[in-house]
Curated annotation (Swiss-Prot):
It is an enzyme of class 2 (transferase). This is Serine hydroxymethyltransferase. Catalyzes the reversible interconversion of serine and glycine with tetrahydrofolate (THF) serving as the one-carbon carrier. This reaction serves as the major source of one-carbon groups required for the biosynthesis of purines, thymidylate, methionine, and other important biomolecules. Also exhibits THF-independent aldolase activity toward beta-hydroxyamino acids, producing glycine and aldehydes, via a retro-aldol mechanism. Keywords: Amino-acid biosynthesis, Cytoplasm, One-carbon metabolism, Pyridoxal phosphate, Transferase. Homodimer. (6S)-5,6,7,8-tetrahydrofolate binds at L128, G132, H133, L134. PANTHER family: SERINE HYDROXYMETHYLTRANSFERASE, SERINE HYDROXYMETHYLTRANSFERASE 1. Belongs to the SHMT family.
Amino acid sequence: MMSVLKKICGSKNSLKSFDNEVYQSIEKELQRQKSQLQLIASENFASKAVMEAQGSFLTNKYAEGYPGKRYYCGCEHVDKIESLAIERLCKLFGVKFANVQPHSGSQANQAVFASLLTPGDTILGLSLSCGGHLTHGAAPSLSGKWFKSIQYTVNKDTYLLDMDEIEKLALEHKPKLIIAGASAYPRKMDFKRFREIADKVGAYLLADIAHYAGLIAAGEYPSPAEYAHVMTSTTHKTLRGPRGGIVMTNDEILHKKIQSAVFPGLQGGPLMHVIAAKAVAFKEALAPEFKTYSKKVVENAKVLAQELQKHGLDIITGGTDSHIVLVDLRSQKLTGKDVVDSLERAGITCNKNSVPFDTAKPTITSGLRFGTAAETTRGLEAENFKEIADLINEVIQGLISGNSSSVEKAVKAKVERICSNFPIY
């Protein structure tokens, strides 16, 4: 007998034949990724192996619970996969316990909040306008609504974290949780000092390493594993895996609380196809080649920052220790929105970003955020990023001179040439 799926979708059961509208949109997105330079700091290109795992039959399997303790039968194979993911993740970051089920980095953070806090408790996190993340206590986020959120900033002259000021705020407000992490901070963080401050006020320390995780795993960025009570991260960005979240700790008691917070506290059935893709990505990150890749990510970011500086652009903190490069456009009297729109028309995608103490609206901003992880995956080297800096400058100068249309067209042709020399897949 013919299956219901075959009756609905046809005997070939292909996306193209059944839903050409979705198929064409996917194909167009693939062509966009192939023909544009992806400089969004939170993006990367997952491997075919990762995507094969995520697109597997595991999407059919429900598996509430944890390996060996499921609420459904037929979980012996997904138990093996999740156990592999946990084992590899613990090895990758040198931790004892890990949860690989969170659907996102935000949900990973929520699980930590649910484990360690009660509504009304005080938390201390980096201000969104100074490079923090929504989940670090920003007013629009649940973290800013459920808890008393105190926000630390950066030094007004150097734009670096002011650890003495953070300690002063901690001593004054006695937070129950201190968050060390960022979405737009290019420099190294002093996790040891963060832990010392946390210990002085009896606070937990959460290290949100979503942006830096791959660099940490490769030894290119300081690891908080020795200092943080809990670490959270996404699995894409510099880890180059599928979109998802993880939670790690060396404390067994906290681990048990986190397990309960993820399931049944926040989520029901885990996405086993995504967990399989995470397991594959962790294996990739354990390979020697990943260390070489991560080293190049940072080197390329440094080159990009240096070359943009040569063109007269202001680089926040004067450079970078990571994959992130932040540009302050205030001296050019341009907005982030105007520049990113022009760059996109020229085939370069990045994102507008607030700079420290920005007075522009978040939908406008006075800055740009670039990242080098995706294009380094593609194979671009330092010399290529020098050219990219030149192209970015050409677009900016085109806006300043009022000649943006012709400049965008010329730059787009150069971008397409670069992309054709470095195919993604």
